[in-house]
Structure formats: structure tokens, C-alpha cells
Amino acid sequence: MSRWLWPWSNCVKERVCRYLLQHYLGHFFQEHLSLDQLSLDLYKGSVALRDIHLETWSVNEFLRSMESPLELVEGFVSSIEVAVPWAALLTDHCTVCVSGLQLTLQPRQGSGPGAADSQSWASCMTTSLQLAQECLREGLPEPSEPPQPLEGLEMFAQTIETVLRRIKVTFLNTVVRVEHSLGDEDRSVAVEVRVQRLEYCDEAVRDPSQAPPVDVHQPPAFLHKLLQLSGVCLYFEELPSQADPPQPPLQIGSCTGYVELMVRLKQNEAFPGPKLEVSGQLGSLHLLLTPRQLQQLQRLLSAVNLADPAGLADKLNKSRPLGAEDLWLIEQDLNQQLQAGAVAESLSLYPITNPLNLDSTDLFFSMAGLTSSVTSAVSELSVYSVDLGSSVHSNMAFHRPSTPPHSGGKMAPTPLLDTTRPDSLVKMTLGGVSLTLLQTASPSSGPSDLPTHFFAEFDAAKDGPFGSRDFSHLRPRFQRACPCSHVRLTGTAVQLSWELRTGSHSRRTSSTEVHFGQLEVLECLWPRAATEPEYTEILSFPSHSGSEASARPCAHLRHTQTIRRVLKSRSRRSTACHCHSELSLDLADFQSDVELGSLDRLAALFRQVTTPSEPPAGLLTEPPQATELQTVFRLSAPRATLRLRFPIPDLRPDRDPWAGQAVRAEQLRLELSEPQFRSELNSGPGPPAPTRLELTCSDLQGIYEDGEKPPVPCLRVSKALNPRSTEAKYFLPQVVVTLNPQSSGTQWETAYEKGRDLELSTESPCELQQPEPSPFSSKRTMYETEEMVIPGDPEEMRTFQSRTLALSRCTLDVIMPSAHIFLPSKEVYESIYNRINNDLLMWEPADLLPTSSAAARPPGSSGFKMCKSAFKLDSDSDEEDAQFFSMASGVPQTPAPEPSRRQSQSTFSTLVTVLKGRITALCEAKDETGKRLDVTHGELVLDVEQGTIFSVAQYRGQPGLGYFCLEAEKAKLYHRAAIEDYLLPTHLEVPSFAPPAQLAPTIYPSEEGVTERGTLGRKGQGPPMLSAAVRIHLDPHKNVKEFLVTVRLHKATLRHYMAPPEQSWHSQLLDFLDVLDDPVLGYLPPTVITVLHTHLFSCAVDYRPLYLPVRVLVTAETFTLSSNIVMDTSTFLLRFILDDSALYLSDKCEVESLDLRRDYVCVLDIDLLELVIKTWKGSTEGRLSQPLFELRCSNNVVHVHSCADSCALLVNLLQYLTSSGDLHPPPRPPSPTEIAGQKLSESPASLPSCLPVETALINQRDLTDALLDTERRGLQELAQSSGGPLPQASPVSVYLFPGERSGAQAPLPPPGASSHTLGSKAKEHENEEEGDGDTLDSDEFCILDAPGLGIAPRDGEPIVTQLHPGPIIVHDGHFSQPLGSTDLLRAPAHFPVPSSRVVLREVSFIWHLYGGRDFGLHPTYRARVGLTGPRVSPSRSSGPNRPQNSWRTQGGIGRQHQVLMEIQLSKVSFQHEVYPEESAIAGGLGQELDERPLSRQVLIVQELEIRDRLATSKINKFLHLHTSERLPRRTHSNMLTIKALHVAPTSSVGGPECCLRVSMMPLRLNVDQDALFFLKDFFTSLAASINPMVPGDTSEAPRETHSRPGSPQEGQSEDTETASNPPEAPGSSHSSSDQQPIYFREFRFTSEVPICLDYHGKHVTVDQVGTFMGLLIGLAQLNCSELKLKRLCCRHGLLGVDKVLCYALNEWLQDIRKNQLPGLLGGVGPMHSVVQLFQGFRDLLWLPIEQYRKDGRLIRGLQRGAASFGSSTASAALELSNRLVQAIQATAETVYDILSPASPVSRSLQDKRSSRKLRRGQQPADLREGMAKAYDAVREGILDTAQTICDVASRGHEQKGLTGAVGGVIRQLPPTVVKPIIVATEATSNVLGGMRNQILPDAHKDHALKWRLEEAQD
């Protein structure tokens, strides 16, 4: 090298400099440089060029050769200075200084670049040897002969190479500007990159020692270039139109610090590594953008497409031959098609999802398609995933690999080696990055020149803004730099890596990786007129801040994009290429604030940033070839903390959306373990695919934070083991959001719908369409005229949910494998309820970007469908017609005028699935007074299995319509009223779902033995245990929201626990759920109307008393509850329908689980029962217009099946329930010593005060007479002193009740029973009942007096008494005509409106009384109990058992079904009314009533029957209504009527007084001796088994409101009562003031009741009733004995119901003994017929005389006498004759039985006799039927005799031959002689009976009612 250091000549220097400039830069200049144009300073070695304009075409050709996406528009260079150190050329470097370089570029139009050759970057650098040769030859004259090689040419080339390596280029004040026109708009945008200084040199300049040796023949494999930049700034300019003045560009970014880039170029392909590698370092990068700027930048970058897929496909598709790998793939695909069956079968079991949507048919031109070859797509994936790295040369040969052996019948394809090679690699390290994105385009707050102020703030920092490990110190600086609302991304220690790989198969892959040492994403909101901003941490990493920051990056972003070609020749696609992108984000433990206002602002920001897609020019324009894009996004982190902030909803129209964060102090912190988020976005030709966002985690914890209060763990969701998987896989918590798109109305869709309409128009109009899916059952269930709404079955629910999810714009699917919700108090629940229900759900997004409708609607959005016919609006072709909220445009598209509701899209659907869940609620524990208990709380736990919650809003595009569904396969409720407080858990554990130890099961699935009906079908096919469906409809015009709620509970059991009202599970649950709604600004709550339908199927109530040895089970096959609930209304209606229910009792209390049919006894069976409850809040005036509470009940029949012990147990249970037995433990039974001592200390005063009835009545009357005068004198003195009227005396004041002192002043007696008092009116109101015994109430007629009625004279002549002289004047309309039928239960009109009313209408009861016992330990003993013994007739004791109609009537094993009686009360009506207090009715009644009514009861029994079903009795009806011609049955008559009126006493002391009135219809008694004794024994055993009412602890038992006279009243204090009572002995019983008997001030039996009695004695019984009574009972026979129950009226007062019964029985018995013995004895034996016989003769003679004396009509008297003689005498004679004939018949039958031989009778003959006996028991209805029966009897008798003789002869002949036959006939002769007598008497009896029944039809009817048919008995 040293020999080249001679002095350079000027010629050489000029040639070298000119050549260098011309060679490198000449073709870029507009003028060509020559030696004359150079101005050289040869001594200093410098050259300068100024004001150079670049040649645009040459530069663009150079850029096009490099496949650059940009082209030059204009270029200018201020100056170019080149300095060459000639003196030290080989040791010093040459410098090129370019000042004022300005380049204006724009995106290049035309096909984009393909895989650029990286050598083009160095194509301008030719070899130094060529350069030396051209340099020396240029300018010399052409030689005449070939030139000779220059000596030292290689040495000169080596020198040039050395000089070129040491060139240093410096760019000063460089401006690179990229402009882009925005489509059809006038405006354009420009981005400028301003670089103050850029130095470019070779790596040898910095470190000459690392430079490789110079070799002119072998260039180096890699070139290393160094770029150093400083003062880099980014500017953005929006070029205005020509009319607008230009604006200076705005700075949007700056690079602070030192920027250094190392460029590594590979010149030899044999070496591994990328062709171009750039690595650099950057201090910090700050960006400040507005949404519009970011949008324009996106459009600019999209225009500058670095990898245009169309160009790539065009370039790579040109003349590409089939290579070895293509032929191999073809062969593989052919092999797979041959095995398509096996592959398809395997893939059907394990489907393979193709995340890249790669289609192997796109690889070749020659293949039609590999549609069924999924494996080929998988093989292609494997091919594309192979990375050869840097060890494979580009010219390697491909060989087909060897085929592996077959395994399992299938061949796995061998992956093909990939040919992708690294092309470019960029690695950057940034000290810090900050991106500040303003939320508004023109912020109102902040300085006017915000960019200048912003970047000046950061340029002032000398040490850089990212000096600390956290970002807390940056917030004040950003507050000063940008005082306006923005979103900021800040990151430090950023490492950026980008790699581009290209290869065969027209595929290019680019991958980008970004690592953040620290990262923070903030929203900084500046409210108006605020000095401090409000921060929302969108993404932060608290664990990576501070001194303990980890070296591991907090965020790792990976982005991989693969582009491959798609053939254009395929007609089914219009895509030019397929682009698949994967974006993966790995985060460290992070936290994020989730606030709806911030999300709304971010969404608005996103809508501003995103570029709307350009619509096609027209409908018939062919769409351009689109790119099929598929983007997969994944996010994962070890832990995540989401802080959900609850917004403050503001629905006012004039609210300020930028007023700041309107959030509550409460927040919900969600801690997720191992969260993973995945989303996939697809775009391209064809219908748009739905977007799916999926979030999974292994564990989720929710902590509710309320300000300064301690945090409350309220939610825990964890994974659960999958029981169906053998690999122990888990179900993970999952949240999936699916965004379904809306297809636009294109020409193809319009054509399809047109054809669809033509197809549908030809359908038959009679064809039924498929019903629309609904959550309600399609099976119509009607009750009366109302349709019962029932939730749908599981299939209907699934159909509705799947269809709704498919037709929803947005769906949310949440899966919770194991969930636990914990609510520690009602306050926390109320807070959470208001935060979620009133804040989250009521929040609405603000109008952040107000735009006009014309600008918001994209062109072409209103498709051609607006002209579509409405003929078939419900067809399936309108599925995509619904309006849809576009994520790209952010503007809801305008819907069609009348969209099809059937195919319109719903707005939002939610499906929450809980495999196992538990809700724990801690509620308040209160005592009986409602006061909260300290240190205790109640607890409720609800467990759910396989539960689903489904909700849809704006169903099918209807704004006010929504549905809500709830299902649970199993549900269990546990409860405990009071538990001691314990420490609340700091975090929730995963529940084990075992029953809580301290809680009792309350509602749970019914056990197998409890349900009556088994599960139909296989297991799991039945309906779920709990299902609910709610329909929500809001009418915005009326502001009315209607809820249709249906609930179904299937096979559930309620365990009933008796508790105080405030401690029951339902009261605590309702109190816990009764929360107040916080008001919402700008929201007017609508009027809510709720229609509730609750259905319980196959449910039960299990009750186990604590102190009663019985277990109770109530089952109901169907229980329906319907209600209409309207807010702010005074009326509430509730209806219950109970169908097929029963009550069971069991005495097996020690067994936990029982079987219904084996261990229980059904005692109550209800067929259908309806209850209607109506409540009224009352009026504001305080007056009642209707009852505050009204209960109405009606049913068809109630069956009671009981023996004496089960009935007594039922009565004891009712007493136990009414007295709240579980709450009051029974007293300890006294020991025998205490009992003996108590008996010795008893005094006469302590003896029972229950005296005989006669003695009590005598004492009563004596006391009344003795004290009457004294009382009158005292009242007269009192009235004279007070000046008031003199009241009449009442005998009620003579009693001294317990609790009154003997020396106390007698209380004031009530006013007498004057004609205007309420009591008198109540009595006289029903005087009409005394006349005929019929209860006919009238609300308008009130008979006050009937003057003139006196004692009739003895001759019976009526005497007319003249009351008013003169004519009688009739006033028309004086009495109002009643409207409709009269309500017998209604109170008179002058009564006040009751405050409560209970009504039972037409309820029927049937009481089945069985013999034996249902419970007990000795079944053999129970079988002997009953009528077995001397009472049973030997001839009837062997009767068969009665058949069982149902298993419910089986009862216990000791029940005797052959011993049965039935008591039936048909159409029972009852009404109980309670009247308000005196203050409530005083204003309404005034002085009309002197007595205040308290309550009124009415009981009406339309029909009362007692049926005899004993096997030993022939009686049919034991008791029934007696009707005859003299007493016909009235149409609306009631058999029994009882009316009771309770009034308040006029005195201050005493309880309510009752006026009782009873009326009854005539009775007919058919008494069998066995039935009578059974009833006696039954009720005796029943009375003995009923436990007496034992009062509990008076300190715990609540006092009754009403008590008998003498008890303290409500307003009287307990101290007064205690002072008035003497102290009792410790062993004495409690005072009976708590349970006072009713005091009856008046008792009236208003009607005289005739009774017709028949009695049939069977056997003498002397062991119980004595000898005489036993003989009398056993031998007595009564027929039509007549009795009468006389009218009763007792006004002396009776205390207790027992006294009333004793009084009535005593009066009737005395009357019967004194006056009715003749009528009773007239029925003994045949006396009734004899009496009738003589009565007929008497009437025949006496009636004409009586009629003549009365009115002189003798003929009328003769007619009456003849009619009476005919009906009485003739019927009596026939009856007597029939009795005589029957007696002869009985005697003949006895003789026949004696004379008949003992030979057996054939079976056929026995059957014939039994059938004749059945027909014989039925009396003929008339003479014709009697003659027919007589003929049949004679004919059958003759045939029977002949058949008997033939049978005897044949049997004797078989046994002994002819002798035996003759002997048998001779033995049969005596009974044969007697047989005609029997037949004749039977025929005669039939004829006489027919004649009697024809004369007297009532006799036949009475016979049919009295005697039981033999068929019914058997």
C-alpha cells in the first residue's frame, strides 16, 4: 500500500471526483455533471453542490427497483459538500455532508411489492475492481487496438475499496414528508419526519480493528453500516382545501436521547441469517395524537402497504411450475382421498379445529378441491410451522421422504420441509415510550398550543423522564404537559423485534415481539373547571413497581402475520390472499379498573380512531378482490385483579358527559387466577362471521369494598372436576361474549329473498306453521275460563334459548363450575343490589360524539329491502334484517320500516350456567316483638345443582320486551333462625356442598319414598326441580311495566318448623330481600304490574312436632298460586288452587326416612280446593268500603279417612298447631307423691264447677229471680242521677266470673233488648225461619212485630182483629225488588263493613269412619277391636271385605275396612266476619247502633248424610233429609244453618257476647244396632284419646285478643289484673283468663224439626248398658217413629258450648218424655201401619164434618176424606198384608231348610239363587213391575225345583245307581211340597209391594234410601 502514496495528479483527482458524483448521484439530478461544472478545492479536497433538484422519474425507478411502497413527488437538496482527505486518504475518512434534504413522498399506486431482494439495498455499490477500471478508462480516447491490462489495477481497486469503507455521510436538517389523499375528499394529510442530524458510516469507521481485510475478488459476506440520529421529530399536517388558509404542521412525536441503528446486510446467500438486519437503541419516544390524527395515520399506513397481497400473489403466480413438494402433496392428497372413510370417522369422534382456516385446495392449479381432506390442512400447518433457521441453504434440493409404515390402519402424513427463510430482522431497544391519545379532537381545556407545550415539557428534562422504576413521578409532569382528558400508555425498557420471512407457496410471515419492562395504561380525565385530574388505571402492574421490581418483563406482546396466496381462478372466492394474524399478550400480575364511563369513552375513542369501510359504488358493481383476514388474539397472565367501579347513572338529557368520573365509593374487586383471554376476528368475502370473546380462569374471588368499611368476600368461583372424563380434566370458569353481525342487503340476498317469497306464495294457506319458541309451555292448561301459564319443559326451554342466542346481536355466556356467593348482612346485600341493579343495569352511555343522522348513516346502508313486500314478514328469509350496532362505524344503523319480528335480532342475551352453586345469607334475628337480637343472626343457605339463568333484552327487536328464565336440576334450602355471631371469613373457600352443620334442611328434593308417582322415563328426563320464566314488557307511552312470572317446583319437600312469626324462614328471607331502591337521576320508575303463576307439582310438606309423637306429611300433586300485583294500588289478589292433595300421619318418629305407602296413613284427601285472598290497604279517610282482608275457599270434595286413634291424633295435631306447641314445651308431669298430696289438700271450693244440667238451670233461674229486684232498684238510682234513659235489666250481670273480686262493684249491665237494638234486630230479622223451618234471609224485609197473633181458640176458628180502620193503601215500590239470588251468607245492610272476612263456599266433606286402629304395636289385637263379638250376627259376620278404591284408603294394618261409616256434608258454606273497632265505625253509623258488633259467623250445610257401610248392616243411609208429600224438598233449602253474632258488652268489664241461632230441616234416621254401637264406641274412644288443652308458659304464650267476661281487656294493664286477683298457690293451675269459653247471651233454635226414626235391633247386649236396656235395645224394632225437636229460645245466658248443648238436649228430652211418647211408640213393630189404618177411617168420617163447619163445602170434605183414606188405610192394609205374607214366607223357608236334605248343592244352582236373592231385595216401583217380578218368581221357583230334583237324582245315580236315584228323589219330596208356598208368598209379596208403592210413591223412595243394594255391599 505504501507504494501508492505518491502525489495525486489534478487530472486524476478531477476524474475521480466527477466520476464519483456522476456515478452515485448523477442520474438523480436533473443536470448532468461534467468536469467543467465541478468547482474543486484540490488543496483541501472538497467539493460543494447547492440547490439541487432531484429527478423524480429516476428516483422513482430506483425506488421501484427496490420495491418500495413509496414514490417521490418532489425532492430538493440545499447543499452537498464532499470532503476527501487526499493527504491521508487511506487513514482518514471521506465525508459527505447533505444539508436541507427535503423529500416529498406519496404511496405508490399500482401493484404492491413482493419479496424484495435485500441485495438491492447494496446494488448501488459495485465492486471496487470494476470501479477502478471504469474510472481509469473514462475520459481517455478510444484506442485503435484492444487495451492491455493496466498494471496495478488490483492495487488501485483495493485502494478504492479501502476509501469506500471509510466514507462518512452526514445529513443535516433532513425532512421526509409523506402525503396521502383521502379518497374522494378534498383534504389530504401529510406526515413529516424531521431529523436534525443523521450520520451514516461503516462499522470500520468506529472500530477499525474489527474491519475484515480487503479482498477485491471475494467481497465480505456481511456489510455493517451504522446510523446515528439525533433531534428526530414527527409532525402531522392536514392539508386544507384551496379555499382554506394553510396551517403549520403540528408536532405529534419526538425522540429524545441518542438514536443509533446498526444495519447488517448479507451479501452471500450461503451464509445463514436474514438478508437485512437492523438493530438499534432509542432513548425515549413520546407521541401526542388526537383521535382524528390517529385515524388519518391509520389510513396512511394502510395505503403504505409493505406487503400488498395482490402484488405478492401476482408476482408469485406468474409461471410457477409444479415443484417436487407440489407433486408430493398431490400424491399425499390422493392417498388420503382413498382413505376418506376412515379419516372422516376418526375426525367425527375428535374434531380438529383449524385456527388458520387454511384450505389445501389453494396450493395448486391442477387440483379441483380437497374438501374432505382435513388432514391435508393439518399437514400444511405442520409444513408452515417448521423453521429452518440459518442452517439450510437456499439452493437445497427437496426429496420426498420415505413413507412410514402403517399403524392402526391409517397413515400419518409426513410433514413437508418448509422453505421459508428469514428476509429482514429489526431489533430495537427503547428506554421509554409514551403515547398520549387525546379523547377529543379539539380539547377545550389546556393551552392553545398544546403540542408545543407538551413536547417542550419533556425536552426540558435532561436526564430523561424514565429514570424511576414506577410511573408515579411522571403524573405531575404529564399534568403540566397535557392538562386535558386523554388516554396514556407509558412503558419503559421496551424491546422491539420484527422479522420478515418469505418462502415458497406464496407465503410471507412477519412476526413482531415487544417486551415491556414496565407498562401502564391510564385514562386521565380532566373535568371542567378542575385543578386535578381523575385517573383510571386501565392496565397497571403494581408488583413491578418500586424497589422490588422483577427483572422479568411485565408484558410480552407477540404478533405473527402469515400471508399466503389464494388462486384467482376459483369462482367460489373473490379473495386474492389469505391473511392470518396471531396476537399474543403475556402479562405479569396486573390490575385494571373497569368503569363503564371509561369504557364508554374508550369506545367513543375507538369509533373515532377506526376507519369506516368504504361501501361499494353500486349494487351491480363487482366487488374488488378482498383479503380474507383472520386475527386470533390471546392474553394470559398468572393473576389479574379487576376493580369494578360502579357508575352513578344519570338519565337526564342535559347531563354533561365530560363532568368527571361519576362513580360510587363502593367497588367490587375481582381476583382471577390464571386468566386467559382469546378472541378471533374474521373478515372477508361472504357473510360476516360472529366475533367470539372468551375468558377463562382457574379461580375467581370477588371482594366487595365499601369505603372505609372492611372488605367483604362475596364471591368465589373455582374449577370443578369433570366426572365424565377419565383423564381428570376440569371444568374451568368461562365467560364468552359473542357478537353476531348483521348481513347487509346485497344483490344476492335480495335475489334469494325474492325466490323465497315466490316459493312461499305457492304454499297451502291451510298449512299450520311451527309455533314460535317460547319459555312458556305450549300445552294449554285451563282453569274455568282462565289460562294457566306454566314454564316450558326442558326441551322447550332449550329450543327458546338456543334460538334466541342465535338471533341476538350480543350474547354473554357464563359458566361457573363451582360458585359460592356470601352475603354477610342485609346492608351489604342492599348495597350490592343497588350497585348492580340500579347503577350497572340502569347506566346508559353518554352522547360523547353528537353527530347528525345524515352524517352518521353510511351511504348505502338502507338497502333495497325497503321496497320488500310485507306478504311474508315471518319467513325465515328475513333473518338478517334486524338493526345492528356496527363496531366499525359506531352508529346504530337505521332499521327497516317494519322489520320482521320473527327474524329480527335481539339486542342482548345472557346465559349463566352454574354446575354447583351455594348462596349464604346472614339475616337479622328478631324476637316476637320485632326487636333485633344482639350477638345472634339468622342464616340461610341455598345450594343449586345444574342451574341456568337466561335473560334476553329487546327480544326480536322490540324495545320493551324481554324474557328471564331460571332452571335448576336440584335446589336445597337450609335455615336457622338464630345462630351466635362468628368472625366473618377473610376470603371464601371452595364449598364442599355438604349440608351445613348448624342449619336445618328446609326445602330439598323429595325422597324416593315420599313422592306418590314415580319418575316417568329414564333418569334425567324429567323436568327440573325448579324452573321459572318471566316475561317483561314495558309500555313507554303509558310508563307501565308488566311482569308475567311463572314458577314451577317439581318434587320438592318443605320441612316445616314451627317458629315465631319473625323467625320463620320465609319471614327472614322476605325481610332480607326487602330492600329499598336508590333513586336514579332522570328516571321515572314505571308502574309495575306483576302477574304471578306458581305451580308446585308432586311436592310435599314434612312436619315433625317436637312434643307430639307423630310425623305429618302433606302432599300435593298440583298446587297453583296466581296473583296480580300492582304497585301503588290498594288491592291485592292472590289465588291458590290445590289439586289431588293428601295429609298423612305416622307414629314412627324414630326413623329418619320413611316410605309413604308403607309407613304413613292417609287421613285427609282433598280433590280440588281453591283459595282466593284479597287484601285492601284502606282509604285515606279511614272509612272502610270493603274488607281489608278477605279469604274465599271452595272445593268439590274433601275426604277424611280415619279410625278413632288416627282421628284423635289429627285432632291433637290441630290443637297442637293452633296452640303453637313447638314453642311452648309441655309442663313436667307431676310425681305420684305430688298427685296424692294435691288430692288430700283439695277443698270443696276447688272441686269442678261443672254441675248437672238441671241443677245449673235451677240455680240460674233462682239467682235471676232473687237479684232482679235489687238490680232494678240500683239501675233506677243510677239512671236518675245521670239523667239518662232507664235501661232494661239483663240477667248477664248476675254472674261473677273468675278474676272478679267478690266485694267489687257489679259492672253496669248492658241495655235491655229493646226493639231498636242490634241484638233484637238480629233476632227479629230471622223470624221467618220459625214458620216453616227454612232459612230464607232477606236484606230488605225486617219484621219488627206481628200484632194480633195470639192463642188460637179451641175450636180452631180464626178471629179477625181489625188494626186500622179504613181502606188499606198500597204503595208501589215500597219494598225494593232484589236483584238476583239472595246471598245467605251476607250480613244485613245496616251492619258495618267488616275489616276481615273468611268465606267458604260449597265445600263438601266426607268423613270415613273405620273400625280398628291405624297405629299401635299389636296388629292382632287391633284386628279384634270393633264389632267382633256378641254384637255381630252369625249369619252376617262372614261378609267379604270392601274393595279398596285407592291405596290411600288402606290406612294402618289394624284398620277394619268392613267396619265403615261415612258422614257427608255437601256444599258447606261458612263465613266469618270481623268488624272494625268502634272508632272506625263511629262516624259511619252514628247513633243507629247501641251495641257494637265484633264478629259474625254463618254456617250453612245444604245436605247432611250419614251412610252406613258396615258389612253387618243392610242400612244404606243412617241419616238423611226427610221429605214426603207433606214435607216436600224445597229448591234452595239448607239442611243446617247456624248463625252467630258476637257483640261487645256495654260494660267496661267482660268479653264478647254471642247471639246464636240454629235452624235445621226435617231428618230421617235409619238406625242399625251395630252402626249405633260403632258410632258410640268410635266417639267414646275419640274423646278419650284427645289430649286436653294444657296451657303453656304464660310468659311465652301470647294473650288472646278476646276473652270471656271478667277477663282484662286490651287497654287494661297487667298490673291491674294482678291486683284484682288474689295470689294463687304455687301448685295451683294458671288462671283461665287466657282461654275463656264463649258467653252466649242468647240461644235460639228457630225451627221445629220433625224426625222420622227407624230402628232395627239385632242382638241383646247386657255387658255395657245393663240387662233391661240391653233387652230393649236388642229386641226393639221401630218403624216410622215420629219425633220433633221443638223451638228453643234461651235469653238467660249460657257460658260455653257445652252448656248450650246440655241445655238443648235437656229441653228436647224433657219435651219428648212429656209430649212425644205416643208418636215414638207408634212406630214399634206394626203399630205404624195400624195407626195409619185407623187414621184413614177417622179422616174419612171427620174431614167432611170439619170442612162443613169451616166453610160449608161438604163435597170438598168428602174428597179430602176419601183421599186420606186411600193413602193411609189402603197403604196400611197393604203393608200389613205384606208383613203377614212375608212372615208366612219366612216360616216356609225355615220349614224348607229343616226338611231339605244335607246333600250339597251344585255351584250353578247357588249362583242362580244368589242372583234371585239380589233381585228379590229390590222392591217393585209399581203394580206392573210387581206382577212381572211375581211371574219371574213363580217361573224361577218351578225351574229351581225341577233342577234340584234332577241334580239329586243324577248325583244318587252316580253314587248308588237306581236305588240311589230313587232315594234321593224321595228325600227331596218334603221340601218340594213346601217350595210352592215359598214361591207363592214371594209372588204375593211382590204384587202387594207394587200396589203399595203405586198408591204411596214416597214409600218406594224411602225404601231405596234406607236399604242398601246388595251389589253395593259386595
UniProtKB/Swiss-Prot annotation:
Main localization of the protein described in the UniProt heading: membrane
Pfam family, one: ATG2_CAD
Keyword vocabulary terms for this entry: Autophagy, Endoplasmic reticulum, Lipid droplet, Lipid transport, Membrane, Phosphoprotein, Transport
One term under GO cellular component: lipid droplet
Modified residues (Phosphoserine): 764, 869, 875, 877, 1246, 1282, 1290, 1381
Statement: the UniProt record of this protein carries the keyword Membrane: yes
Record keyword Electron transport present: no
Taxonomy, superkingdom: Eukaryota
Subunit organization: Interacts with ATG9A (via C-terminus). Interacts with TMEM41B. Interacts with VMP1.
Family from the record: Belongs to the ATG2 family.
The name this protein goes by in its record: Autophagy-related protein 2 homolog A
Organism lineage string: Eukaryota, Metazoa, Chordata, Craniata, Vertebrata
Encoding gene per record: Atg2a
